[in-house]
């Protein structure tokens, strides 16, 4: 939605300029393209020349589809622009969940210089010394981060992270097959048997448990064993209804109409609405998770100063806007927010009002080791419940098939014997 608005505005500006010219023939195709294209201006170009010619490279580990790649005409390729400006090569790879990121770093099998985990995972990594303090002298563009995103609970002294995006979780659905009025849609639709095998569910424990906890009236940060078990039972109850537990696949399946209903992050939902006009997105009134993803440097990083330069680059106003315009998530960056059109700034999905945030949202905190362990065990139990269901049905079906085969053989022999007699 935002990308389409941006391009339309650029096109209108180009047309207006063309109409104002007495001789439109002097406008070349290159000039028209320049009018439509996003441009990059940095505040201190000399700052970015410190490592030129040194052959440095940084390893960046980020969520999929979470940076402007220049794939859309007229948009910036953020990593390519950084490489061109600094001479530092960016090795860029993706992960699908916070848990995947954590496992990769904890296992020590790879070295990364920049990561972008979510709030609760940042808190966990700080506790386990997996991320290191930042030198904010190397990140002057931190000045653009809005005050209400500084010193968050997951990084109280703001030593380890720079906010990148934020958003809420809601429900995306196909309006051509879901016949429930939008204002009545809530999390219980993910348990609605009318949509058997057409529902997708998150394939990570924290997000999935959160939805069950909201339905049961619990805090998203509960550590009570009875409540965690009740949430797990709720997810097990859902197993026979859902088509599958997925993450990135939600985008393709919903866009193609291969599923009808799924929980989804608001930014990704706004992007997918561009591809399928039948889809709708709603943030349930019963409550939701508000998440913040922030940029950190792991303790294993080999190029800390170059990584801080990359973080500062992501906070350049033109870059911050290009990213937000492309991925459609909400921004904590004051200059990027001012560059958005008024419609987007007032969009209740992208920027819900303060009352909704205060009363209907909850930010994840890092749970205790004991609670994390119990949730993971319950999650594993829930996931294995699918196999148990298969086994429970497989045995009777196999038995019936076996009996039928035996009866068939006996009938065949009986008929054959009768033929032999006559």
What residue ranges belong to the model's regions?
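C-terminal motif of bacterial Sec signal peptides marking the signal peptidase cleavage site
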Residues: 17-20
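A structural signal for short loop-to-beta-strand junctions that line the ligand-binding cleft
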Residues: 47-50, 106, 110-119, 132-171, ...
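Short beta-strand->loop
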Residues: 132-143, 161, 277-289, 298-301
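Ligand-binding pocket segment of bilobal, Venus flytrap-like solute-binding proteins
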Residues: 200-204, 208, 212, 220-284
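Periplasmic solute-binding protein
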Residues: 77, 119-132, 149-150, 154-183, ...
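Early extracytoplasmic/lumenal segment of secretory-pathway proteins
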Residues: 35-124
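Mature extracytoplasmic/periplasmic domains
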Residues: 298-359
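Conserved C-terminal helix/tail region of periplasmic/extracytoplasmic solute-binding proteins
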Residues: 355-422
């Amino acid at each position: 939605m935002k990308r389409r608005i941006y391009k339309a505005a650029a096109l209108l500006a180009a047309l207006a300029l063309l109409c104002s010219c007495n001789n439109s023939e002097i406008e070349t195709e290159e000039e028209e393209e320049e009018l439509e294209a996003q441009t990059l201006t940095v505040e201190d170009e000399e700052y970015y020349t410190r490592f030129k010619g040194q052959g440095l490279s940084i390893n960046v580990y980020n969520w999929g589809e979470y940076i402007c790649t220049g794939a859309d005409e007229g948009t910036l390729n953020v990593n390519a622009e950084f490489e061109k400006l600094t001479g530092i090569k960016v090795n860029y790879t993706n992960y699908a969940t916070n848990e995947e990121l954590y496992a990769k770093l904890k296992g020590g099998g790879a070295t990364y210089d920049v990561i972008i985990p979510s709030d609760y995972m940042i808190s966990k990594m700080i506790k386990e010394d997996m991320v290191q303090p930042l030198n904010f002298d190397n990140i002057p563009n931190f000045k653009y981060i809005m005050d209400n995103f500084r010193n968050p609970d997951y990084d109280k002294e703001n030593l380890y992270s720079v906010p990148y995006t934020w958003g809420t979780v809601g429900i995306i659905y196909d309006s051509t097959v879901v016949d429930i009025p939008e204002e009545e849609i809530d999390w219980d639709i993910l348990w609605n048997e009318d949509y058997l095998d057409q529902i997708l569910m998150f394939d990570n424990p924290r997000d999935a448990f959160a939805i069950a906890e909201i339905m049961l009236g619990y805090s998203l940060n509960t550590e009570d064993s009875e409540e965690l078990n009740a949430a797990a039972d709720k997810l097990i109850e859902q197993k026979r209804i859902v088509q599958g537990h997925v993450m990135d696949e939600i985008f393709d399946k919903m866009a193609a109409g291969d599923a009808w209903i799924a929980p989804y992050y608001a930014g990704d939902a706004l992007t997918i609405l561009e591809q399928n006009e039948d889809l709708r997105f709603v943030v349930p009134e019963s409550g939701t998770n508000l998440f913040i993803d922030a940029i950190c440097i792991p303790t294993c990083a080999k190029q800390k100063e170059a990584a801080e330069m990359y973080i500062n680059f992501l906070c350049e106003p033109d870059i911050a806007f290009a990213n937000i315009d492309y991925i459609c998530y909400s921004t904590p960056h004051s200059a990027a927010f001012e560059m958005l059109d008024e419609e987007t700034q007032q969009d209740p999905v992208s920027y819900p009002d303060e009352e909704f945030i205060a009363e209907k949202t909850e930010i994840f905190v890092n749970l205790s080791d004991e609670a994390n362990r119990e949730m993971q065990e319950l999650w594993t139990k829930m996931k294995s419940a699918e196999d148990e269901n298969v086994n429970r049905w497989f045995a009777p079906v196999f038995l019936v098939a076996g009996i039928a085969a035996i009866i068939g053989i006996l009938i065949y022999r009986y008929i054959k014997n009768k033929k032999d007699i006559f």
